[in-house]
Structures are given as structure tokens and as C-alpha cells.
UniProtKB/Swiss-Prot annotation:
<feature type="binding site">
    <location>
        <position position="98"/>
    </location>
    <ligand>
        <name>Fe cation 1</name>
    </ligand>
</feature>
<keyword id="KW-0560">Oxidoreductase</keyword>
<feature type="domain" description="Ferritin-like diiron">
    <location>
        <begin position="81"/>
        <end position="234"/>
    </location>
</feature>
<dbReference type="InterPro" id="IPR001519">
    <property type="entry name" value="Ferritin"/>
</dbReference>
<dbReference type="InterPro" id="IPR009040">
    <property type="entry name" value="Ferritin-like_diiron"/>
</dbReference>
<keyword id="KW-0934">Plastid</keyword>
<dbReference type="GO" id="GO:0008199">
    <property type="term" value="F:ferric iron binding"/>
</dbReference>
<feature type="binding site">
    <location>
        <position position="136"/>
    </location>
    <ligand>
        <name>Fe cation 1</name>
    </ligand>
</feature>
<feature type="binding site">
    <location>
        <position position="133"/>
    </location>
    <ligand>
        <name>Fe cation 1</name>
    </ligand>
</feature>
<feature type="transit peptide" description="Chloroplast">
    <location>
        <begin position="1"/>
        <end position="43"/>
    </location>
</feature>
<dbReference type="Pfam" id="PF00210">
    <property type="entry name" value="Ferritin"/>
</dbReference>
<keyword id="KW-0408">Iron</keyword>
<dbReference type="InterPro" id="IPR014034">
    <property type="entry name" value="Ferritin_CS"/>
</dbReference>
<feature type="binding site">
    <location>
        <position position="133"/>
    </location>
    <ligand>
        <name>Fe cation 2</name>
    </ligand>
</feature>
<feature type="binding site">
    <location>
        <position position="216"/>
    </location>
    <ligand>
        <name>Fe cation 2</name>
    </ligand>
</feature>
<dbReference type="GO" id="GO:0006826">
    <property type="term" value="P:iron ion transport"/>
</dbReference>
<keyword id="KW-0409">Iron storage</keyword>
Amino acid sequence: MMLRVSSSPAAAVANHLSGGAAATTAPARVTAQRSGVSLSAAAAAGKGKEVLSGVVFQPFEEIKGELALVPQSPDRSLARHKFVDDCEAAINEQINVEYNASYAYHSLFAYFDRDNVALKGFAKFFKESSDEEREHAEKLMEYQNKRGGRVRLQSIVAPLTEFDHPEKGDALYAMELTLALEKLVNEKLHSLHGVATRCNDPQLIDFIESEFLEEQGEAINKVSKYVAQLRRVGNKGHGVWHFDQMLLQEAA
């Protein structure tokens, strides 16, 4: 027969104290957990701060190499950067091409503006073409200066002054000359683009493509249609006169 021993008052007190300790440990555990979360958050924040403040680009260190390249001589360009001599020379050549084309168109303008030719529409077309080619030359000159190059103008060849043709007449012959000249200018632009590509100059490549090549293609297409139309109307008479009137009324 087993006797059930009841807890002594001391044991009861101990149990009570033990229960009280357990009761008090729960809030302590929560507090500890909360502290752990706070510490984790702080650690994460510290880690993030470490990543954000990680040194990747040190401008004042890396700039030392570029600073040494800034020219001190007053006769040298301060803006020039990654612009080689071949590109500079090719741009000067293209400037000369554009000025020669402008000069040729100006001669055509003078011919058709004569009192004994008197095709005012053709004169207007060639005057506008001359102005456009000159603007192209000036645009190239501005770009040359912007990149730190030096503009060196070259000689311009004296153009033809007479454009009458025994078989084709002056109107068709002049427009065929124009088509050939536009294609030649386009070839020169492609050559300039090739130099820029070979020299790995993406800025010059973008400039040629965005400012010249698309417009040049449109000009070739436009003049091609003029040649086709003039071949249909014949080289003299009312057909040429009506074509001249169309050019006179056409917007630039």
C-alpha cells in the first residue's frame, strides 16, 4: 500500500516560486526575441549601408589620368577627346565635297536664270540645292570644331557653265548631272562613315547617319523621279515648260 505524500509547505513555496519564474521568463523571451529582430534589422541595415557605400567609382582617383591629358598649350583644343587625325582629315575632305557640289549647283542656277534660257523653276531648284550643300558644309565645319578638330578648307574646282546637250536638251541633261552628283556625294559620305567605323568613333558614326545619310537617300530618290519624268516629256517644248512650272511652285 503506497502512501501519497503531500507536498510540504516548503515544496509548495518552491513550486510557486518556480511557476512564478516560468511566468516571468515568457515576457523575457519575447523581449529577447524582439531584441533579436531589432538586432537583425540593424545588422541588415548596416549590411545595406555597407553595400550602398561600397567604393566602385573613385572619380578623384580615376580623373588623375584624364587630368594629365588636358592640354596646357593655348594653341591646342581643350574639347578634343577620342578624335583621331584620320577622322579629322576625312571630315575636311567631305567639307570640300559639299562646297564643290554647292558650286556646281550654283553654276546650274546661273545657267537656267539666263534671259535666253528662262526656266525659273529649274533656276529655283538649283539655287536651293546649292544652298543646301553649303549648309551641309557648314554643318560639318561646326561638328569639326565641336570635336576639337581644325577646319582646313581646300580648293574648289571651277564648274561647267554650259549645259545644253544636242540630244537630251539642257533640262534633262542638267537633271541627270544632278543625279550623278548626288550619288557621288552619297559615296563620299559612305567613305566618311567607313573611316569613322574603322577608327571606332561612335559619335561621328551617329552624326553621319542621323544628319546626312537618310537625307541623301531621299534626295537621290527625288531626283531619280525628276529624270524619269523629263525623259517622258521630251527635251524641248511644252513638256519642259510644264515641268519647269511644277518646280517653280514646289516647296523647298
